[in-house]
């Protein structure tokens, strides 16, 4: 899905569907291999590109599918999740996990766009999908991305540790990018410069059905990812990358997205000879591991 193709459609949707008609404005990225009517990118992954215009506000709701937001464009918007107000900046990852109230608004002056990634297909298949409307949330002063901002150091007031399933709801891109650059500099022999978004209290995946990662390709690097059982999604945050998947080759510009089926190797090439490229990846690994079907070939 080329962002240059999606963006004009999103802006047109903004003209045609004000908030009075639809409180959330999304273009679903449906994989024709699964049937367009199913509106899914893989067996367990739903993708959508959502637009928020200046001054808009979408009321609070909660739902059973887990979701994340990878911010694609713009600034000045925010998402409030469980009372925590999360600023939205390009490349940030924001969680809206199962059962948590969330709403969003825009105080800036330019359109804001993000990529929605949900485990909706599997939750819908289990006949467990629903959504409930809610009231506007009171905003808390605390923020998880500040309290859990250093690796290996966690809050423990009077020796008590957090038992929240999602202690961190916002993963700033500035920090993930710095971690990748630091890892690349510290381990120049490392082929796959990659980090995983995790719960800092447990080390487990940030959400319990889908996994989320950031990958850095060194200048001019070609990296072969092994064939694994889970399907996966690649979204380019920065740079220019060629993705070879089975017999198809995609050239990804910034904000472009593509999918790879399970059990297929993927080769990624950074087309920039003098600068790194950065890729956001979502996959079904946590689900496959829990079901005992995870496999690398």
Regions found by a protein language model. Give the residues of each.
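A short, N-terminal "cap"/entry segment at the start of jelly-roll beta-barrel domains
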Residues: 1-43, 132, 139-209, 213, ...
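C-terminal functional regions that serve as terminal interaction/effector modules
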Residues: 1-4, 201-206, 212, 219, ...
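Short, flexible loop/turn elements at secondary-structure junctions
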Residues: 31-33, 51-56, 64, 72-73, ...
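Short beta-strand micro-motifs in enzyme catalytic cores
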Residues: 46, 113, 193, 211-213, ...
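A short beta-strand-loop-beta hairpin characteristic of the jelly-roll/cupin
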Residues: 53, 57-90, 96-100, 105, ...
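Conserved metal-binding segment of the jelly-roll/cupin
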Residues: 81, 87-109, 114-119, 245, ...
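Double-stranded beta-helix
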Residues: 107-169, 271-297
């Amino acid at each position: 899905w080329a962002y240059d193709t999606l963006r004009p459609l999103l802006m047109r949707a903004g003209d045609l569907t004000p908030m009075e008609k639809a409180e959330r404005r999304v273009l679903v990225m449906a994989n024709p291999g699964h049937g367009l009517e199913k509106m899914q990118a893989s067996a367990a992954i739903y993708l959508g590109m959502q637009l928020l215009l200046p001054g808009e506000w979408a009321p609070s709701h909660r739902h059973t599918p887990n979701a994340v937001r990878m911010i694609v464009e713009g600034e000045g918007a925010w998402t409030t999740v469980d009372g925590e107000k999360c600023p939205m900046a390009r490349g940030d990852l924001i969680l809206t996990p199962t059962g948590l109230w969330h709403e969003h608004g825009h105080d800036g002056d330019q359109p804001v766009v993000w990529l929605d990634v949900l485990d909706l297909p599997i939750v819908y298949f289990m006949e467990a999908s629903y959504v409930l409307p809610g009231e506007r949330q009171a905003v808390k002063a605390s923020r998880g991305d500040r309290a859990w901002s250093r690796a290996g150091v966690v809050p423990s007031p009077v020796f008590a540790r957090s038992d929240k399933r999602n202690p961190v709801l916002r993963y700033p891109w500035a920090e993930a990018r710095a971690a990748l650059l630091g890892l690349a500099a510290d381990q120049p022999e490392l082929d796959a410069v990659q980090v995983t978004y995790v719960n800092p209290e447990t080390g487990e995946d940030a959400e319990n059905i889908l996994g989320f990662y950031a990958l850095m390709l060194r200048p001019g690097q070609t990296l072969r990812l092994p064939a694994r059982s889970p399907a996966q999604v690649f979204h380019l945050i920065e740079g220019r990358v060629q993705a070879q998947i089975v017999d198809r080759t995609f050239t990804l510009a910034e904000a472009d997205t593509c999918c790879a089926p399970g059990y297929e190797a993927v080769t990624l090439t950074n087309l920039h000879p003098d600068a790194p490229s950065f890729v956001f990846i979502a996959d079904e690994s946590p689900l496959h591991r829990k079901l005992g079907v995870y496999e690398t070939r």
